[in-house]
Curated annotation (Swiss-Prot):
PANTHER family: THIAZOLE SYNTHASE
Function: Catalyzes the rearrangement of 1-deoxy-D-xylulose 5-phosphate (DXP) to produce the thiazole phosphate moiety of thiamine. Sulfur is provided by the thiocarboxylate moiety of the carrier protein ThiS. In vitro, sulfur can be provided by H(2)S.
Organism, scientific name: Bacillus cereus (strain AH187)
Lineage of producing organism: Bacteria, Bacillati, Bacillota, Bacilli, Bacillales
Catalytic residues identified in the record: K96
Stated name of the protein: Thiazole synthase
GO CC term, one of those recorded: cytoplasm
Length: 256
């Protein structure tokens, strides 16, 4: 089970809802992924205008936990305003904190992310900050009392996969709360690798919505995350420089 604050989930796949070709493909991809947490940018939805079509109209909101994010925020104050807007609309108190500090790389601003997380915790939110793979920042966020840490595998939408597995492994090893790898996942192999490192979950969007067949890719991501977690729990063999015979040699007789 993936436990975040008071919530428990069977699926370890968190799915973003943007950039799908149309609502039908989006819904089918969500269904086959079996994701229980769906994330979306509050700024890209007019959640107060009933005349504007949006994702929430099409979803059985009782079936999913919605994770609004603060994408578009440039500082802590903007992030808090967006989070309060989501809460006022009746959405979940759980919020993904996203404060971008660089428009080219879309990497998060560490100072403003820390500040926004602290402010939202004081407001009673369940806080999931999106961060870089900065080990020290992850520890500071943990000490602050956030409910999960979401380090990026690589820049948002890049599809580069996990470019710094060592840092991610350090973050996971020191964590006493869920670590959800977020951003940069490009393939099922990337998602499986994140889980093999010991991540508690993976959040992805573009890898599915931008695939040639988003529905098949959603299913592939589901299976790869399950396989990666199972492999982590099983425990891989140690790496060795030299070969080790896999067939027993003792107790065998050679018939001439």
């Amino acid at each position: 089970m993936l436990n975040i604050g008071p919530f428990s989930f069977h699926s370890r796949l968190l799915l973003g809802t943007g950039k799908f070709p149309d609502f039908d493909v989006q819904q089918k991809a969500i269904d086959v992924s079996e994701a229980e947490i769906l994330t979306f940018a509050v700024r890209r939805m007019d959640i107060f205008d009933a005349k504007q079509p949006n994702l929430l109209e099409r979803l059985d909101v009782k079936k999913y936990t919605l994770l609004p994010n603060t994408a578009g925020a440039k500082n802590a104050e903007e992030a808090v305003r967006i989070a309060k807007l989501a809460k006022a609309s009746g959405l979940c108190d759980m919020i993904k904190v996203e404060v971008i500090g660089d428009d080219r790389t879309l990497l998060p601003d560490p100072v403003e992310t820390l500040k926004a997380s602290e402010m939202l915790l004081e407001e009673g939110f369940i806080v999931l900050p999106y961060t870089s793979d900065d080990v020290v920042l992850a520890r500071k966020l943990q000490e602050l009392g956030v409910h999960a840490i979401m380090p990026g595998a690589s820049p948002i939408g890049s599809g580069l996969g996990i470019v710094n597995p060592l840092n991610l492994s350090f973050i996971i090893e020191q964590a006493t709360l869920p670590v959800i790898v977020d951003a940069g996942i490009g393939s099922p192999a990337d998602a499986a690798f994140a889980m093999e490192l010991g991540a508690d979950g993976v959040l992805l969007n573009t890898a599915v919505s931008g695939a040639k067949d988003p529905i098949k890719m959603a299913q592939a991501m589901k299976l790869s995350i399950e396989a990666g977690r199972l492999g982590f729990e099983a425990g891989r063999i140690a790496r060795k420089r030299c070969a080790t015979a896999s067939s027993p040699l003792e107790g065998m007789s050679v018939v001439e």
